[in-house]
Design a protein with these regions (language model features):
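Structured mid-domain segments that build the active-site/substrate or prosthetic-cofactor binding neighborhood
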Residues: 196, 201-204, 214, 220, ...
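Surface-exposed binding patches on compact interaction domains or structured appendages
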Residues: 699-731
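Glycan-recognition and processing domains
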Residues: 771-807
Length: 808
């Protein structure tokens, strides 16, 4: 069997004719191999390598060595030639004189070769996040590849796959300033490398206060993108390769671009601005954004403008832009990738209304990829109808993993729930959205988990599309082991996988910014208790794993796991405790004061987790944790007037005060002498309930001495007397075998010397019910969606239960 030993002695055969970007990526891979083997492999630029084993890489049409190997019958390149972003990965015996074996990486084009080179790194155990998150690979002496490792890659499922760096201040911008003195070409080299390692190829650059084509300095960032094969675009409101902030730098009364961002009053100036942008970037590989919005990502016309006004203006804009592209880039518009993003009010202008025909079927949009969008919260707004799917230019999706805007901003720790992402994007693909996928990734930092899945899904929908969302659990397990299999035992990795999933699921219910003390009721249905238990488990798992983490992997561990998990769990815990503090203070429980102190501890911990994230690895991730994330108010979508939870302290009563309450009910008794009616607990009317947990709490400076009395033979208590300074937890057990029909049992909790609380428990003897029978509980009946009596699928259409998408 043909094989090759990959180690530090292997040589890279480099051809002068190779793409410069491919050579640069080969350098990245050599650096990866140094991390694996301890020494960087040498480069041979001639025809006489010193080693008998070599890595021969090249692009079909730009490599004489590949031509020679094909002519000699050593390679079969027909499965690669002419394809999009495809590579051959093959072990070849005796490829040239003096060489025993070679690993050949042959790309159909520049990006195909680059993906093939990075695939080699992955085969050696190198994570795509090796440089972005400092994920160190396991050290090895060698890796053996055989002819069984040879294969030809598939064409990517989605043509353009990428992300949008958006809302970049204070997080990404601060990080870039610290490490690169700005969002410049040096900064973008790190971003481009990450994008390509994740098998993406398309980028919308940062644009809040950044100018991709000016801050390189100059065009250096654009030139580097083109060198590396990264296709550049601009966001939904930045037409003709112009950054949104550029116009503000160039406008003026004496400017050729005029002094008004208005196609109505300054058509010539805006046209000149677009023309010069197209000319400046025409030598690079771009996808050109079409259309127009108002300044700073606002509506193009005022509130008084009609649908007809807006649609007619956009028709003029599109006609002008297409003409400019013909004049400056290519007369054949079909050869120029273009998009129009149907986002915010532009979506309405596309579809029109009952009075005004929209831009649907507009001739100027022929050949333009129509970018649909989600609702800013991860749910696709529209998908192409069957009649729309033949649109020349195809469809794309603009998806938010970060949002600075309504209905509520979320910009801190990555909060995209993988099963929802899977559901939305696989549905989009099935409806023909296959040309472009781009996600608003915000600051990149802490989004790596969700971003990895988004781009892997776009690259190979066949592998990760699957039949249902359960495949996202498999992905989570694989992703975590890609990062940490080299440094943790399987038992710890299993707990980390569960924790990563649970943290992600918590955020599917409520994101950080909009969590508050009202979301989960402090006692109803034990929902707050369940969340609190989950948070404590997450914190314990993360801290246990940190103790086992090698010091050289702490940067990767903290950035990819510890900070997202602990930051999220601590925040959720803080709000749960705040809700409980508020309720208990209202009841005057002394435990409320302890809870107030615990809330304060969580507030301090929140700051400590961010500080730890920023300081780890000599500040490698400094800035990524800066976004505001706590207590966004209902009246604002953003962080204006946001606040940490309020803490309430209870002042102790003068005399011993007792509070008796069921654990899942806010109603309580104090046992006072006047006007108190008994509490009635009906939990035991349920077939599956034979125990009720309740609490005896102290609401005074003096301790409460209590006694429990009952004449009911079927009520049994875990404890019947004691002294309480804070809270006593007691369980009453109902022996249903003694019941005959429905009965009511009474018991009394005595605050010795100060009163008595009376409790009634309603219970019913055990009954047998037929399968599929639903029981009332306190006036409610619960039926899960999976409790259907019949389900009939028709052809390829039907209902599929997705357990991962439930809230429970």
């Amino acid at each position: 069997m043909v094989n090759i030993v990959i180690n530090q002695e292997i040589e890279f055969l480099e051809e002068k004719s190779a793409w410069q970007g491919v050579k640069r990526v080969a350098g990245y891979v050599r650096n990866d191999m140094e991390k694996v083997f301890g020494k960087k492999p040498a480069i041979c630029a001639g025809d006489s390598p010193k080693s008998q084993t070599v890595i021969l890489y090249g692009t079909i049409g730009k490599s004489k060595r590949l031509d020679m190997l094909e002519s000699a019958g050593k390679l079969e390149l027909s499965g690669v030639r002419g394809k999009r972003e495809v590579y051959l990965f093959q072990v070849v015996e005796n490829p040239m004189e003096g060489v025993k074996s070679a690993l050949v990486i042959a790309g159909s084009d520049k990006r195909g070769t680059i993906y093939g080179l990075f695939y080699l790194s992955e085969k050696l155990g190198v994570s795509p996040l090796v440089n972005w998150n400092h994920v160190l690979p396991k050290r090895r002496e060698y890796v053996i590849l055989t002819e069984k490792d040879s294969f030809v890659s598939k064409e990517p499922s989605v043509k353009y796959r990428g992300f949008f760096i958006n809302d970049e201040w204070p997080a990404f911008g601060t990080w870039a300033d610290k490490h690169f003195s700005g969002i410049n070409a040096a900064c973008y080299e790190c971003v481009f490398e990450l994008l390509l390692r994740l098998k993406g190829n398309y980028l919308w650059p940062a644009m809040w206060a950044s100018n991709f084509n000016l801050d390189g300095p100059g065009l250096k960032s654009a030139e580097l993108a083109d060198e590396l094969g990264v296709v550049m675009g601009t966001s939904h409101h930045e037409p003709c390769m112009r950054a949104g902030a550029e116009y503000g730098k160039m406008r003026g009364e004496d400017s050729p671009y005029g002094d008004a961002w208005s196609f109505l009053t300054n058509e010539d100036g805006i046209t000149n601005f677009w023309r010069d942008g197209l000319i400046r970037n025409r030598s690079f590989e771009n996808v050109i954004t079409m259309g127009m919005r108002g300044e700073n990502d606002t509506a193009i016309l005022g509130a008084d403008a009609t649908m007809e006004d807006n649609v007619n203006l956009l028709r003029r804009v599109l006609k002008t832009q297409n003409q400019l592209i013909r004049e400056t880039i290519n007369e054949n518009l079909d050869e120029v990738p273009r998009i129009m993003v149907l986002f915010t009010e532009v979506e309405a202008f596309f579809y029109g209304d009952e009075k005004t025909k929209g831009l649907l079927d507009e001739p100027e949009l022929e050949g333009v990829t129509l970018m649909l969008s989600d609702n800013n919260q991860g749910a696709a707004r529209t998908l192409p109808t069957k009649a729309m799917r033949n649109h020349k230019g195809g469809y794309g999706m603009y998806y938010h993993m970060d949002m600075h805007g309504g209905p509520m901003a979320f910009e801190w720790i990555g909060s995209t729930y993988l099963p929802k992402l899977w559901e939305q994007m696989t549905a989009a693909y099935e409806f023909g959205v296959q040309e472009i996928w781009v996600t608003n990734i915000g600051d990149i930092g802490t989004q790596e988990y969700g971003l990895s899945f988004f781009l892997d899904l776009a690259y190979d929908i066949g592998k990760w599309g699957g039949r249902d969302a359960a495949i996202t659990k498999e992905y989570t397990k694989k992703w975590l082991r890609t990062q940490f299999a080299a440094c943790f035992e399987e038992s710890i990795l299993s707990r980390m996988t569960e924790a990563l999933w649970d943290y992600n699921r918590l955020l599917a219910r409520r994101k950080h910014e909009v969590m508050n003390e009202r979301v989960y009721h402090p006692v109803h249905f034990f929902e707050a208790e369940d969340v609190l238990r989950c948070c404590e488990k997450l914190l314990n798992t993360a801290k246990e794993a940190r103790r086992a983490c090698p010091i050289e992997m702490l940067g990767a561990f903290v950035s990819l796991f510890y900070f997202p998990v602990c930051g999220t769990a601590n925040l959720m815990k803080m709000w749960i405790l705040a809700g409980r503090n508020k309720l208990y203070a209202k009841q005057n429980r002394m435990e409320a004061n302890d809870l107030a102190d615990e809330v304060l501890a969580c507030i301090k911990a929140d700051k400590e987790y961010v500080k730890d994230y920023h300081e780890i690895d000599d500040g490698a991730f400094y800035g990524f944790g800066l976004s505001k994330h706590i207590g966004f108010r209902d009246e604002n979508w953003n962080d204006e007037n946001c606040q940490y939870p309020l803490r309430t302290y209870a002042y102790p009563a003068d005399e011993p005060r007792m509070i008796v309450a069921k654990k899942n009910d806010e109603h309580y008794l104090t046992g006072g002498f006047w006007c108190e009616r008994p509490l009635v607990w009906r939990d035991a009317m349920r077939k599956d309930v034979s125990e009720i947990a309740f609490e005896i709490a102290c609401g005074s400076e003096k301790e409460v001495q209590y006694e429990i009395h009952t004449d009911c033979p079927w009520l049994h208590f875990s404890k019947k007397q004691g002294t309480v300074a804070k809270t006593e937890h007691i369980t009453v057990t109902i022996d249903k075998s003694q019941l005959k029909g429905k009965e009511t049992g009474k018991f009394f909790v005595k605050n010795v010397g100060y009163g008595e609380a009376e409790i009634h428990i309603e219970a019913e003897e055990e009954k047998k019910y037929p399968s599929g029978y639903f029981l009332w509980d306190n006036g409610r009946v619960a039926m899960d969606a999976g409790h259907y009596t019949a389900k009939k699928d028709v052809k390829n259409t039907g209902f599929l239960r997705m357990a991962e998408r439930t809230r429970r």
